[in-house]
């Protein structure tokens, strides 16, 4: 077995105290390491591709604060921009010129977005876009895909299990059945089920929402023709197509998955990268649809901190960095080196692994594959993944503490970082 030498004394003390103050000791469940076991790590600071815990241990980071840190943590251009704006105040609760700047940058970049509304999180963006789908179409039902995560709003917390996959049963206590009865589900990459749902619910479905590349049940890519098929089906049925690009937006291409796959939805949700590490979300799309949003139209949605100058500044500076020539070539090069290396090492060490990458997003399953949907992903060896995760952590490599989360690289990762990661992976996989 891998020798564990990590000193986590302070992490243990802080986490023990946190458990008396916050549910599970955390502000978001995955941070408690329930999926992988072992001592959760309490972090102290970040810089570039690295993260340090309160005990002074340094790690190469492939979580990237769950996606936003695509330029690397604490990038000086982002920090300098924030320092300058901070002197003017943290929030106005009123129109801010910086909103115009970021809005124009996003509209110029993302094919589907003609108008945009800023909010404060991806969850908030998806809540609002669902309301907008219903308002615009006059229909109540929506189709989502099993394993696709659209935040923790009641209407999206639907369990998509085998025999009850389309019955709209809630997936969390506290979510009434009547709230989710209009949420229909289908397996990802399954066009036939989507067609059947439209046939069974004529003129009742407002639209289809999905992660165009799944990142919240591990890294799962769309089959050839899947996104195009959804575009065709929704158009034929007078329904809307919504891409949840909170994770993929500005990560797998500057214009997101819709640029990468050349499929334009009607509406798009964004988050993470467009806030440069600060809390942010957004939804946007066709002008005729977005004109329904208050105060231009009757669909109400508001937010105290929406469009605040700090989040707008961090987003502007981040997008300026990403727009530089060669950015996505570099991200793809470094991520391909990592993903291909992990798959090759798995073969060398006789571990069954399925995975891949697109630009700065990657993932592996301890699973023979192929993995086309959440049911496939659930066949993974979670015990083996947990051992792999802990072994990597003990040797200074921080991966997402769940088999069902994608990984992220950044412009700050170097070939040396990748080589060290692969050398560690070989050592750990050899011990599994």
Swiss-Prot record:
InterPro entries assigned to the protein according to its UniProt record, in alphabetical order: 4pyrrol_synth_GluAld_NH2Trfase, Aminotrans_3, Aminotrans_3_PPA_site, PyrdxlP-dep_Trfase, PyrdxlP-dep_Trfase_major, PyrdxlP-dep_Trfase_small
Cofactor: pyridoxal 5'-phosphate
GO biological process, one term: protoporphyrinogen IX biosynthetic process
Modified residues (N6-(pyridoxal phosphate)lysine): 272
Reaction it catalyzes: (S)-4-amino-5-oxopentanoate = 5-aminolevulinate
GO cellular component, one term: cytoplasm
Molecular-function GO terms, alphabetical: glutamate-1-semialdehyde 2,1-aminomutase activity; pyridoxal phosphate binding; transaminase activity
Domain of life: Bacteria
Oligomeric form and interacting partners: Homodimer.
UniProt-recorded name of the protein: Glutamate-1-semialdehyde 2,1-aminomutase
Species this protein is from: Trichodesmium erythraeum (strain IMS101)
Gene symbol of the encoding locus: hemL
